[in-house]
C-alpha cells in the first residue's frame, strides 16, 4: 500500500514539475515614473538547464514567456545546472523573443560551480544583458544586478550595493538569486528585490527547511519596511525532477 502511494505521488510530482504556471502579481512602488505605470515584467528563475531540462524544455518555456508580451524580462540565476551541456544551443531560444526593454540576467549558485565564462558568453550571445555588480537606468527606474556569490555574506553584499551608487530618491529593482540578507537590501535603498533559489522547497520535507531558513521570504511577495521582496518557486527543478506541494512558475509583474 505504501509503495503504491509513493509511486502515485512520485508520478504526480514528475508530471506537476513540467506544468509551468503563470503567477500574476501587482507591485506598487513609491515614486514610480509615469513611463513605468502599467508596464509588465516577466520573472524567470531556476530553470536548471542540463541533462533533465533540455532544448525542448527551454523552447516551451520561452514560448510561454513570449505569450505574455511583457515589456522586460528578468532571469534571476540558475538558468544552467553547472553540468556539461550545449550552452549556446540552450540559450539560443531567448533570442527569438521580442522584448521592448530587453532581457536581463544575474548568475545563480549553480552557475558558480564551474567557470561561468561559458554561461555568460552563451547568454550574451542570445541578446540577454548580464548584470554583475551593475546598474542600468531605464526611464527613471534603477535596475541593479548582483550575482549570488556577491550576496552570500552581509557585509560584502552591503559594500557591493554601496559601490553601485543607488539613488534613494528614485525607485530601484534588485535582481539577485537568493533572498539572503534582505535587511541589507532594504538598508541600502532597494525598493523591490526579485529572487528565486528556494524552489519553495520543491517537495516535502524540504519545504519545511526552506521556510525555517528564509521565513516569510521563502516564497511570494513580502515586505520589510519600505523594501518589497518577491521570491519565486522557479520554473525548473534540482535533484529529483518532481514537485509536490509547489508549482513550477514564471511570474508576470505589473507595476503601479
Regions found by a protein language model. Give the residues of each.
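Soluble catalytic domains of enzymes that build or remodel membrane lipids, polysaccharides, and related
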Residues: 28-256
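Alpha-helical transmembrane signal-anchor/signal-peptide segments
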Residues: 18-31
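Internal/C-terminal transmembrane anchor helices
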Residues: 1-16
Amino acid at each position: 500500500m505504501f509503495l503504491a502511494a509513493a509511486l502515485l505521488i512520485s508520478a504526480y510530482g514528475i508530471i506537476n514539475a513540467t506544468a509551468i504556471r503563470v503567477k500574476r502579481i501587482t507591485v506598487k512602488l513609491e515614486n514610480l515614473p509615469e513611463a513605468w505605470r502599467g508596464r509588465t515584467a516577466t520573472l524567470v528563475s531556476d530553470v536548471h538547464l542540463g541533462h533533465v531540462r533540455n532544448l525542448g524544455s527551454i523552447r516551451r518555456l520561452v514560448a510561454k514567456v513570449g505569450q505574455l508580451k511583457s515589456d522586460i524580462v528578468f532571469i534571476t540565476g540558475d538558468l544552467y545546472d553547472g553540468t556539461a551541456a550545449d550552452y549556446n544551443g540552450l540559450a539560443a531560444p531567448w533570442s527569438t523573443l521580442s522584448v521592448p526593454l530587453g532581457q536581463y540576467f544575474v548568475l545563480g549558485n549553480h552557475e558558480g560551480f564551474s567557470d561561468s565564462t561559458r554561461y555568460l558568453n552563451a547568454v550574451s550571445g542570445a541578446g540577454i544583458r548580464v548584470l554583475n555588480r551593475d546598474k542600468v537606468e531605464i526611464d527613471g527606474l534603477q535596475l541593479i544586478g548582483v550575482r549570488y556569490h556577491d550576496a552570500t555574506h552581509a557585509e560584502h553584499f552591503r559594500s557591493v550595493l554601496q559601490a553601485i551608487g543607488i539613488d534613494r530618491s528614485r525607485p530601484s529593482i534588485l535582481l539577485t538569486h537568493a533572498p539572503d540578507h534582505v535587511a541589507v537590501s532594504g538598508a541600502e535603498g532597494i525598493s523591490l528585490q526579485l529572487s528565486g533559489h528556494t524552489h519553495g522547497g520543491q517537495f516535502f520535507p524540504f519545504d519545511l527547511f526552506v521556510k525555517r531558513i528564509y521565513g516569510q521570504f521563502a516564497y511570494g511577495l513580502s515586505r520589510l519596511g519600505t523594501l518589497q521582496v518577491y521570491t519565486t518557486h522557479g520554473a525548473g527543478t534540482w535533484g529529483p525532477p518532481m514537485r509536490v506541494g509547489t508549482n513550477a512558475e514564471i511570474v508576470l509583474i505589473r507595476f503601479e
